[in-house]
């Protein structure tokens, strides 16, 4: 059976369901695929297909995630759903499933609950740009005033975490009734898909962003100069363009005099490609793995930042014991480890394996970074945590 060719006729958007346990995230995911497959084609996914989420590894961490896909008239969506609360936290912090927007599921019977708040906060920290709300189980609430109250609470909560609570679309629905084929509730799923289409803008593709290549290796080719290799993370590099080498040492400028891939010379390298970039007048010893090649002025080196971190539990192969302030592991950014020290929040004595925590990290060398960069925490090459840069400090 040959693999189906991926059709690129529609823009591709990544979304996911977030919200409190048992509020109906997986049922909604199933309902969306079912209702949209009737209208636009595609596969319907049953609840248990989605609930038995396969394990994946991201940055050395095992996460259970289900991926489904569906179409609207104008877009193709890839949608992620996680079975457990811990999987959500790991997913959002490691960026295993980057979201262009999220569907926050809140049961009208309960209103916002602790994990509702936690997922919104995490969404803010890790840069989920847009949230659309699905008020679920509305078939079980007869009282219009109660629904309005729950809606108001959700809007307040979103506003509290700097999302535009007042203008956020909220759909009142019942995932279960829609799944059972009740036309009145199926329409609510179509309303939701319409908001996904209109409220979540198309993301800027990585190729349209400023050029960045994390350096994996450096060679010197006699008679030609120095070549750095790596996978282009974003943007395009053209022969003759000026680039900066950023991180670890002082930033230097140089010119790209050649791009090659699979031993063939190219005029340019693009996001996603593994390339060698030839640099003018740069010595082999001036460059090392862990630096980045970037469009001048687009990224700067930093040593201190606020982060949101998930610490692996013992069962996940993490530490067996807690750590305290002054903990000094290695922080793995893109292609290299850098030692750094940890400051914990005032009220926190120690961090237990399995916790997620906000911490300030100070590195011994500067690394090219901006808000949203992901990293792993390692001890002697073993991953013990994962994190994201929330705010660069210096």
UniProtKB/Swiss-Prot annotation:
Main location as per UniProt: cytoplasm
Region (G3): 81-84
GO molecular function terms noted in the UniProt entry: GTP binding; GTPase activity; guanosine tetraphosphate binding; translation elongation factor activity
Aminoacyl-tRNA synthetase as UniProt keyword: no
EC number: 3.6.5.3
CDD domains: EF_Tu, EFTU_II, EFTU_III
Keyword Protein biosynthesis: yes
Pfam entry (one): GTP_EFTU_D3
Region (G1): 19-26
Residues given in the record as Mg(2+) binding sites: 26
Region (G5): 174-176
Annotated GTP binding sites: 19-26, 81-85, 136-139
Top class in the EC scheme: hydrolase
UniProt region (G2), positions on chain: 60-64
Keywords, alphabetical: Cytoplasm, Elongation factor, GTP-binding, Hydrolase, Magnesium, Metal-binding, Nucleotide-binding, Protein biosynthesis
Span of domain tr-type G: 10-204
Compartments, as annotated in UniProt: Cytoplasm
Subunit structure: Monomer.
Described purpose of this protein according to its UniProt entry: GTP hydrolase that promotes the GTP-dependent binding of aminoacyl-tRNA to the A-site of ribosomes during protein biosynthesis.
Family indicated by similarity: Belongs to the TRAFAC class translation factor GTPase superfamily. Classic translation factor GTPase family. EF-Tu/EF-1A subfamily.
Stated name of the protein: Elongation factor Tu
Lineage: Bacteria, Pseudomonadati, Pseudomonadota, Gammaproteobacteria, Enterobacterales
The encoding gene: tuf
